[in-house]
Amino acid sequence: MASNGMASSPSSFFPPNFLLHMAQQQAAPPHDPQEHHHHHHHGHHHEQQQHHHHLGPPPPPPPHPHNPFLPSSAQCPSLQEFRGMAPMLGKRPMSYGDGGGGGDEVNGGGEDELSDDGSQAGEKKRRLNVEQVRTLEKNFELGNKLEPERKMQLARALGLQPRQVAIWFQNRRARWKTKQLEKDYDALKRQLDAVKAENDALLNHNKKLQAEIVALKGREAASELINLNKETEASCSNRSENSSEINLDISRTPPPDAAALDAAPTAHHHHHGGGGGGGGGGGMIPFYTSIARPASGGGVDIDQLLHSSSGGAGGPKMEHHGGGGNVQAASVDTASFGNLLCGVDEPPPFWPWPDHQHFH
């Protein structure tokens, strides 16, 4: 298996137009995979015998006129010697690849992999010194946006690559935005706290004003109620005084028909005693003096008087005597007569009592 690997490595390393490789392709019969599997299981010595048996000694290649580095037919090594050189040749690409990576690191191939401070990522990180950082900070304060000309000037002045300067400005701008957001947040939070405190103070003041308004309304309602009670008491007292004065006036003034009522029975009795013989044929007897019209008043209608006096018990009652034909009054209600005869303008149907005093 190792010999197969050594045999295949020169063909993959050298170009396909290599003369030895061409000679092997021309001389070698088609390779059987079963025989290759058989070689894999039987040792290196058996593998060499099988290769010699199938391949045979390769013919010497003719010298190549265009490639002086290739060996001639006399100097061409055998296949076994070439296989011995394959391990040494196989190690060359690996060392070359390592060397190429180191060259890229020296030449600054890892520009994209930079850390936050502008240094390269990897085993060898290049960090910026203090002077470079100060210069970049001053330029960042002048303007956080980096133009291409300015980037090239800074790179030449600081001995850095333009990509490093651009990445440093990008990271610095991100940190600046974060700090700016924190500052804005703190300022807005302070403003919010101040507004909340002011709002709480206004709410407390509003509550106090509402309480004062309620107290003032209660006082006004109480004062209005007190004034209304005073007015009611004053009106009630005025009414009571007026009623008491009316009662006193009524009690002090005597009834106007009391003297006439007292004198009426005496005069009637005198008239009845003096003219008993000639009074029988008169037929019409005048009423009492209480129904006489006042000096300034008018008369009363006889129909109205009789109608009102006939319905109640307060009217005058008259009795007829068979001997002399005289009429005698039994009882008279002074109040009803006063109410009936007040304000009547018609003349009385009979003569008043004082006009008939000549009968005595």
Swiss-Prot record:
The keyword S-adenosyl-L-methionine does not apply. GO terms for molecular function: DNA-binding transcription factor activity, RNA polymerase II-specific; sequence-specific DNA binding. InterPro entries: HD (IPR001356), HDZip_class_I_plant (IPR045224), Homeobox_CS (IPR017970), Homeodomain-like_sf (IPR009057), HTH_motif (IPR000047), Leu_zip_homeo (IPR003106). It comes from the Eukaryota. It holds the Pfam family Homeodomain. Expressed in seedlings, roots, stems, leaf blades and panicles. Residues 179-223 are annotated as: Leucine-zipper. Residues 121-180 bind DNA. Residues 56-68 have a biased composition (Pro residues). Residues 36-55 have a biased composition (Basic residues). Residues 234-246 have a biased composition (Polar residues). Keywords: DNA-binding, Homeobox, Nucleus, Transcription, Transcription regulation. GO terms for cellular component: nucleus. Residues 25-75, 88-126, 233-278, 299-328 are annotated as: Disordered. Residues 97-109 have a biased composition (Gly residues). One of its GO terms (biological process) is positive regulation of DNA-templated transcription. It is found in: Nucleus. The keyword Plastid does not apply. Belongs to the HD-ZIP homeobox family. Class I subfamily. Probable transcription factor. This is Homeobox-leucine zipper protein HOX21.
